[in-house]
Amino acid sequence: MSLLLEPYTLRQLTFLNRIAVSPMCQYSSVDGLANDWHLVHLGSRAVGGAGLIFTEATAVTADGRITAQDLGLWNDQQIEPLQRITRFIRAQGAVAGIQLAHAGRKASTWRPWLGKQGSVRVEEGGWVPVGPSPIAFDPRHTVPTQLDERQIQDVIQAFADAAKRALEAGFSVVEVHAAHGYLLHQFLSPLSNQRRDQYGGSFENRIRLVLQVTEAVREVWPQELPLFVRVSATDWVEDGWNPDETVELARRLKALGVDLIDVSSGGTSANAEIPVGPGYQTRFAESIRKASGIATGTVGMITEPAQAEHILRTCQADIIFLARELLRDPYWPLHADDDLGGRKAIWPAQYQRATHRDQPIHESDLRD
């Protein structure tokens, strides 16, 4: 049996397989509300056989959105539109997960397909972003307002409040986004954090906010349900956040009740030279897994079922996160089932005629 296609359990939650839909921003919301696009986008990946379906980075405050069109969970009105999505995901046998995020200094930007770079200025309908220090991401981005300690406490509370709303919305996994150069990663990295208070300077100070956010979320998130944290293992820049620091952070997060580290990289520097290639981030997931004893997920240029299977069999990671490959082919998990000799029973009954299998279909196989 393929490891990729075997069920996988964390706490009291079992996933259909070890394939996760990585959070991918759709930039298609109004006022942070999920709509038909999000239902079809996420629902089709659930029909396609992935065991865990993550929403895009969902902002915990309005000013924490990457773009004005991002999903949000900073008010109660945003709960109900997400409920119909989680209901549909569960009906397909998948688990619904949500990534909670704050963009920090990388907030108030343009939707990527518009071809514009940098910040949306206030006079263009944007807002002034916030960050650990008044350091812009690059010359095209607005210099952020430095958060004071009271505002930092507000951010911590916003993550906890969003987690409570996520539970009401029907999600079973929460992931804290501390990667890709967004707010929590900005506090981790000396490239973006030059504070001189308890949140800056030393390693202990720079990890403080991530630990406090994680602790606040774990406190309100049910003990029987898993909590993930996404990290960038390295900034890919000299004197930036590095893999050794990530390993130590992972140990601290495990002690706080985190169940899996979702391992990515980069995002704090526009000048980073990233050696992108097949599975280029997997070695970080492996080193974190071995050194900290926590489960890891890996993402980035994983395109073939055999490649994913090899990663799992060689104990480099525990879950495979797929992103662009699932945009190209929402049914990648079902095709992987064919390629790797899986259970042969996860195609929806409504789609069985496409599988060239002459077998009876029971009413219980029909998807709602």
Predicted ranges, named:
Residues 1-368:
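Flavin-dependent oxidoreductase catalytic cores
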